[in-house]
């Protein structure tokens, strides 16, 4: 009699479970997650499966901190966490496609079911806990940290840039006071002003333009002479 009663209860349990599945009432804690995520059309069910994935991620992230684990166990556990992270992302995409909340708006941060941020979560393959100290992985993190420090270093503390700058950069080169150089620069400046004047000779002022009262524009020769005088005074001040 006891055997028949157990069979009847088992059959009744399976019947009730099938009814609950048809009605959308699913116990996420006792049921396997469906593999076909894109075929799920119930937002509450997707949220339950996502919550279950978050619980597993939180549990495995806590376990990967165990100092008794070997390197092989840490690698396998880190792979499992990354696989769960991808599954969580797929559930979030399905929830968003069904019109539910957009959990991917948090900027790559991952939180467990208690609202605590999971360190190391984000896009791409990540390393959690002691996986960051694995041989080969630790060197990658150290190299990335050094590169980041070099990029964020202020320019005034970078001696390698200042070593390439000599006195000529600040205008104290020996050839700055050469008469031939001054004459050449003056000729080039005069030629540039003449070319500019020729280009603007055929242009007419815009409609409604009026000259400023008691203001006369200098000629090209006057401008060139003024530039030469300024440069001569600057050189004398340096002496």
UniProtKB/Swiss-Prot annotation:
It comes from the Eukaryota. It holds the Pfam family Isy1. Its main location: cytoplasm. GO terms for cellular component: catalytic step 2 spliceosome; cytoplasm; post-mRNA release spliceosomal complex; post-spliceosomal complex; Prp19 complex. Signal peptide: none annotated. SUPFAM superfamilies: ISY1 domain-like (SSF140102). The keyword Transmembrane does not apply. GO terms for biological process: generation of catalytic spliceosome for second transesterification step; mRNA 3'-splice site recognition. It is found in: Cytoplasm; Nucleus. Involved in pre-mRNA splicing. Associated with the spliceosome. PANTHER family: PRE-MRNA-SPLICING FACTOR ISY1 (PTHR13021). Belongs to the ISY1 family. This is Pre-mRNA-splicing factor isy1. It comes from Neurospora crassa (strain ATCC 24698 / 74-OR23-1A / CBS 708.71 / DSM 1257 / FGSC 987). The lineage of its organism: Eukaryota, Fungi, Dikarya, Ascomycota, Pezizomycotina.
């Amino acid at each position: 009699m006891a055997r028949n009663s157990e069979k009847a209860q088992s059959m009744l349990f399976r019947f009730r479970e099938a009814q609950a599945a048809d009605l959308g009432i699913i116990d996420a804690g006792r049921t396997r997650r469906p593999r076909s995520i894109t075929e799920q059309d119930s937002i509450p069910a997707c949220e339950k499966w996502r919550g279950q994935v978050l619980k597993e991620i939180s549990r495995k992230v806590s376990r990967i901190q165990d100092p008794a684990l070997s390197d092989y166990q840490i690698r396998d556990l880190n792979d499992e966490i990354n696989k769960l992270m991808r599954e969580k992302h797929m559930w979030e995409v399905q929830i968003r496609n069904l019109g539910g909340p957009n959990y991917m708006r948090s900027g790559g941060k991952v939180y467990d079911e208690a609202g605590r941020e999971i360190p190391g979560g984000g896009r791409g393959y990540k390393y959690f806990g002691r996986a960051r100290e694995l041989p080969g992985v630790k060197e990658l993190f150290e190299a990335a940290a050094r590169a980041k420090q070099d990029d964020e270093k202020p320019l005034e503390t970078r001696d390698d840039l200042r070593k390439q700058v000599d006195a000529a950069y600040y205008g104290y080169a020996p050839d700055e006071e050469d008469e031939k150089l001054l004459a050449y620069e003056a000729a080039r400046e005069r030629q540039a002003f003449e070319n500019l004047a020729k280009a603007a000779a055929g242009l007419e002022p815009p409609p409604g333009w009026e000259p400023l009262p008691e203001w006369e524009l200098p000629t090209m020769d006057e401008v060139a002479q003024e530039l030469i005088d300024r440069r001569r005074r600057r050189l004398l001040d340096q002496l």
